Every structure is written in C-alpha cells, then in structure tokens.
C-alpha cells in the first residue's frame, strides 16, 4: 500500500505502548526519507506543521513520535488531531504500536529500564495506566501493529512494505554479523565465512574493541586479502540482489561470520551495508557484538 500524494504533507504520527517499538519505527521512517521528529509535544504539532507549510519545504513526508506522559498530553493531542482534520493540505495517519503485557514486561527487564508511568517502578502498573490513557487514541488509529512476535527487523520490513512510495523501497537488504561459536543464523539466506582474514583479537589493544571502532576496522581492511574479498563479495551481490528483487523476494538476509562476531564480521558487515544503501533499503545488525563484555 503506497502513501497517497494528493496532499502537500503526508503525516504519520507514531504512538502506542512504551516498549512496543517506537524507536525502531522512527528509524525506519527516516530510512524511507521522512522528516522525523522524536517526542514532539502535542501542543506544538499544529504550529510545527504550519511552519513547514509556510517555509515551502520539500519535506512532504513527516513522521512524528508522540509519547504520552500523562492526561494533559493526551487531551492536547486529541485537540491537535481535530484541528488537523480541518486542514486539506495534511494527510494524517496514526500508527499505533502495541504488544502483549507479558512481552512489554520482558522487554523492560531486558533493557533494565523503568516504565515512564510506573510510579512504584513496577512495569505492570505503568502498562495498565498507559493502556487506559491510550484507549481513545488507539480507536482513532488507522494502522495498528501488534509487535509481540516481531523482531526489530520484522517491524522495519512491515513499515517499509506499508509506507514505501515506490516498489524499489519495498526490497530490503539485511546485513548481519555473527560469531560461528554461537551458531549460524537460522534466518540467513546467504552466509559468508571471514575467519580466514587476519584476526584483531590477538592484538591486545584491539581485543576489547569491535569492528565498529576505527582502529579495528582499519586493521581488518588494510590487508590485501580483505580488500580482494570485499571487492569480490560486492561484485557477487551486485549480480545477485537484482535477481532476488526481480523474483519478488521482499528481503535478503546476508550473514557474515567470524569466530566471535566482534571484529572481522562486524567490519565487513558495516562496509557491505554502507555500499548497498545507495541502491536498496539496507539494515545492518550485529547479532553477537554484546555477547562478550568489554574490559
């Protein structure tokens, strides 16, 4: 389903339960070329849109995250939505992200964060209050996603499919680094083993670092065999990806593995994603980068 172009500004308001995936959502819209604002106070929404209209901005696609922290914010957002309904140059949509209570509690425990509305620190208390506050807004939402069984990549792909303005944006290249010692990713379409490359792990100063650090990536990429492999891999994928897309595949998961998923695979995955992002919607993840604690 494509976004209509019948109005000047296509507006997506991202809201929903805390922990349901709003951060992933706003990042996905940013990758789709939306002008994104996180946590804009509802009282500023009408003025913000007026300023965009008056500035003759070419930013016709806007995505906003609206987090509710109390009844006052909620009431003001409802008023702002009513005001927007009278503006013919705005096409507003509300994307509501939800998840089961048990899943939200688990996510809060994993991140060790407190629910913003939990006065006592108990997640279920905040979740119950938030559901009550958001009930009317959920009823007004045009799009509702239950992210209970979604990984971040699944949510990204769903958003891309729904909001992409052309067919090319619906094909996703997911690049993943991993460590063979933790197993090969079961959802990988293509797996490449880079354990033959020189390993920074054996250099003491680089051991606690990862392939996202400049010192490590420079070391990995300085070798002739790394450069040749990277060149051949890009050449191979440049041939394969258009064929995958032509066959109607919505995404390709490219997994690059080294021993622990910290250095070589991370460097190559970052390079690969950076190269292909000019032609495809590209997302990079490092599955095992947090498995080993830094010292």
Curated annotation (Swiss-Prot):
Single GO molecular-function term?
ATP binding
**Residues annotated to bind ATP:** 16-23
According to the lineage, what is the superkingdom? Bacteria
Residues reported to bind GTP: 67-70
Summary of the knockout phenotype: Cells lacking this gene show a reduction in transformation efficiency and in fraction of cells that express competence.
Intrachain S-S bonds: none
Q: Does the keyword ATP-binding apply?
A: yes
Alphabetically list the UniProt keywords: ATP-binding, GTP-binding, Nucleotide-binding
Which HAMAP family does the UniProt entry name for this protein? RapZ_like (MF_00636)
Q: What does this protein do?
A: Displays ATPase and GTPase activities. Can also hydrolyze pNPP. May affect the expression of competence via the phosphorylation of a cellular component.
Q: Which family does it belong to?
A: Belongs to the RapZ-like family.
- Name it: Nucleotide-binding protein YvcJ
Q: Which gene holds the coding sequence for this protein?
A: yvcJ
